């Protein structure tokens, strides 16, 4: 019995001096276990362009508050897309997402898209159908993006057909009201006089900000408008119901709402390319092509640089995260560890059709990876 006790004491003493030798017998296996535990929570997205693209598709629909991608045919797009100066300017001068992240700033923007410009097309209303003598236009239905944001600009755009001889045109915008006792059903909004020369037709814009603000305060007063543009011979030149060859010449409203200023902070990271041998957390290029997966409802951009993060987050490099390092040292197998994730993201501007056929120019936050880091 005494010899057995002595043997046990000697064995325990050797364990204390030598340490847990069984854990060190295969150092390579231990290293692999620790590396596997570094980023269990986000390994699905590393080194996977496909996962990044699928995530982008989900994010865009979510941030635009769309349950599914709008189903708009190419023919419908040609009919709905106004051939108008403000929209053509957005398309022609569209700044496809720049890869300019040299300043290293990090934007804290909201999750949902911040709308800047909304193009609203006219629709029919029950009131217009009940009016005797069909009014020459237009009822505009306003989305929540207009109703719950501060309107800074509202322009009604109308197209005037070309004339054969020089003439003066008298443009009048009337607001429909409920019939009064004397039979009046219109009240004037704006009127203007302009000179037209022979040649092509022209687009004319009219400020309707005050009217729009009143409509938003009292939605029941929004019964529609009538548009008249009479030349000296009494001919109406305004395109209110487009005929053959007049697709894209419908009247429409261009509404601009406020954008929220963002705060910023500093951050830096590594940039790599597809041929890089860098194993640490790094930003890699990735271009998303909307046409490639059939999203014709996005007018612009047709593609943009999204980028993605990939790489290892070794604890030896984590001076930036001492608390994480200490947790890992205390429990290396129980700690999930830091992940290679975006630390700076920037928005993209997008011109698109929503589910109601409205054309919206908005800013979608956090769609471009500008910096990557371990966190």
Swiss-Prot record:
Glycans are attached at residue 71. InterPro entries: Cystine-knot_cytokine, TGF-b_C, TGF-b_propeptide, TGF-beta-rel, TGFb_CS. Residues 1-18 form the signal peptide. One of its GO terms (molecular function) is heparin binding. Keywords: Cleavage on pair of basic residues, Cytokine, Disulfide bond, Glycoprotein, Growth factor, Heparin-binding, Secreted, Signal. Pfam families: TGF_beta, TGFb_propeptide. It is found in: Secreted. Coiled coil: none annotated. Synthesized as large precursor molecule that undergoes proteolytic cleavage to generate an N-terminal propeptide and a disulfide linked C-terminal dimer, which is the biologically active molecule. The circulating form consists of a latent complex of the C-terminal dimer and other proteins, including its propeptide, which maintain the C-terminal dimer in a latent, inactive state. Ligand activation requires additional cleavage of the prodomain by a tolloid-like metalloproteinase. Residues 19-266 form a propeptide. Disulfide bonds join 272-282, 281-340, 309-372, 313-374. Belongs to the TGF-beta family. Acts specifically as a negative regulator of skeletal muscle growth. This is Growth/differentiation factor 8. It comes from Lepus capensis (Brown hare). The lineage of its organism: Eukaryota, Metazoa, Chordata, Craniata, Vertebrata.
């Amino acid at each position: 019995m005494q010899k057995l006790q002595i043997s046990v004491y000697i064995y325990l003493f050797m364990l204390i001096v030598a340490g847990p030798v069984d854990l060190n017998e295969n150092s390579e296996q231990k290293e692999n276990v620790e590396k596997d535990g570094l980023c269990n929570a986000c390994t699905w997205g590393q080194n996977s362009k496909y996962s990044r693209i699928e995530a982008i598709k989900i994010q865009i629909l979510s941030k635009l508050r769309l349950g599914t991608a709008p189903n708009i045919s190419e023919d419908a797009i040609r009919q709905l897309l106004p051939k108008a100066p403000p929209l053509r300017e957005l398309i022609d001068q569209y700044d496809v997402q720049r890869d300019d992240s040299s300043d290293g700033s990090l934007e804290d923007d909201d999750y949902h898209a911040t709308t800047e410009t909304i193009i609203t097309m006219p629709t029919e209303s029950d009131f217009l159908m009940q009016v005797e003598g069909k009014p020459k236009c237009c009822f505009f239905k306003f989305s929540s993006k207009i109703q719950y944001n501060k309107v800074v600009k509202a322009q009604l755009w109308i197209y005037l057909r070309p004339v054969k001889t020089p003439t003066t045109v008298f443009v009048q915008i009337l607001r429909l009201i409920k019939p009064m006792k004397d039979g009046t059903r219109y009240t004037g909004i704006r009127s203007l006089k302009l000179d037209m020369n022979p040649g092509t037709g022209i687009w004319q814009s009219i400020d309707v900000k005050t009217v729009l603000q009143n409509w938003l305060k009292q939605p029941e007063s929004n019964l529609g408008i009538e548009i008249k543009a009479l030349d000296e011979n009494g001919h109406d030149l305004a395109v209110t119901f487009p005929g053959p060859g007049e697709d894209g010449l419908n009247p429409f409203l261009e509404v601009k709402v406020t954008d929220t200023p963002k705060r910023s902070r500093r951050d830096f990271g590594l940039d790599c390319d597809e041929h890089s041998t860098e194993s640490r957390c790094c930003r890699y290029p990735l271009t998303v092509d909307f046409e490639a997966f059939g999203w014709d409802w996005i007018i612009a951009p047709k593609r943009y640089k999204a980028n993605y993060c990939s790489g290892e987050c070794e604890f030896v490099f984590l001076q930036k995260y001492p608390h994480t390092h200490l947790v890992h040292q205390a429990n290396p197998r129980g700690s999930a560890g830091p992940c290679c994730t975006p630390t700076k993201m920037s928005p993209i501007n997008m011109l698109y059709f929503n589910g109601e056929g409205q054309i919206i120019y908005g800013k979608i936050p956090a769609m471009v990876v500008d910096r990557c880091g371990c966190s």
